[in-house]
């Protein structure tokens, strides 16, 4: 049974001194995650955005499609810089294989992600 997706929003400061909005996901990322993820994303106008997957154990193909939709909107339409951190080793490989690294920097942890933004 899938754990419902929750998204918490917080602010941090990048190494450059710029404000960063962090969307921290908890639960599984699947088709039912679209509304909470895109709603949280739509509520921020930050130019630097981090997606925190440290509270996520499972992401299915529908979940990956939602993340790609968010990334395409953020980078192409919004001109935003996006980073991702907290992926399990398995999903680090999956995200790399499907090309998410073209749209977001993949980092092992928050400190590294903030340094790279």
How should these model regions be labeled?
Residues 105-109:
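Short acidic-hydrophobic, aromatic-tinged amphipathic segments that line or gate anion-handling sites
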Residues 2-39, 53-55:
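STAS-typified acidic loop motif
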Residues 31-104:
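Amphipathic alpha-helical interaction surfaces in cytosolic regulatory modules
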């Amino acid at each position: 049974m899938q754990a419902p997706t929750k998204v918490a929003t917080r602010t941090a400061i990048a190494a450059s001194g710029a404000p960063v909005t962090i969307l921290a996901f908890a639960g599984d990322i699947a088709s039912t995650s679209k509304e909470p993820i895109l709603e949280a994303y739509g509520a921020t106008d930050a130019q630097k955005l981090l997606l925190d997957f440290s509270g996520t154990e499972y992401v299915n193909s529908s979940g990956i499609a939602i993340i790609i939709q968010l990334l395409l909107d953020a980078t192409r339409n919004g001109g935003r810089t996006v980073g991702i951190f907290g992926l399990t080793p398995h999903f680090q490989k999956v995200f790399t294989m499907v090309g998410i690294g073209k749209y977001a920097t993949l980092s092992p942890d928050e400190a590294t992600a903030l340094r790279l933004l």
